[in-house]
Amino acid sequence: MLQQLLSNAFTMVLIILVINIVYVSFSTMRLILTMKGRRYAAAFAGTIEMLIYVIGLSIVLDNLDQIQNVIAYALGYGMGIIVGMKIEEKLALGYTTVNVITKELDVDLPRQLREKGYGVTSWVAGGLEGDRTALQILTPRKYELQLYETIKTLDSKAFIISYEPKSIHGGFWVKAVKKRRIKE
């Protein structure tokens, strides 16, 4: 039966496309898990990735004489990157640090963000046109977009920069952010 499926050109293209999408999605996830320090999950994803890779590559190498198979392999690779990135966005592993600089000296913004469950450190910063409020907020990545919307609602002219911290040690943030649920 498998041989019959592989003899149909359209089915072959579809199989190669799907295999490569799944393979590259696992590859993307393995890389992200490795970068996040999740070694066992990365090793598991890598094992699945290689299993799929060997199967997919053997099918393509057995059928290199048909250009549509090579094209399906290449398209599957590109689509797999997109799918892997979408999966990673949905998982939203790790934390993000968001720095906010307000247009005005605003002591109310930190309080409003704290009431919503965010850990906020604030200070007065000197800008070109006077004093501003600067904030640093650590939040799980799954709440990052929600935080941006909250900030924009509270101060539509706020300057926002975010980055992913490599490591976090001690302090209020680590304990509180892990336990805390962000309010909508």
Swiss-Prot record:
Membrane topology summary: Multi-pass membrane protein
Keywords, in A-Z order: Cell membrane, Membrane, Transmembrane, Transmembrane helix
Pfam families, per the entry: DUF2179, DUF5698
Segments passing through the bilayer: 9-29, 41-61, 67-87
Localization terms from the record: Cell membrane
A GO CC term assigned to this protein in UniProt: plasma membrane
Family classification: Belongs to the UPF0316 family.
Cross-referenced PANTHER family: UPF0316 PROTEIN YEBE
Protein name per Swiss-Prot or TrEMBL: UPF0316 protein BPUM_0594
Organism of this sequence: Bacillus pumilus (strain SAFR-032)
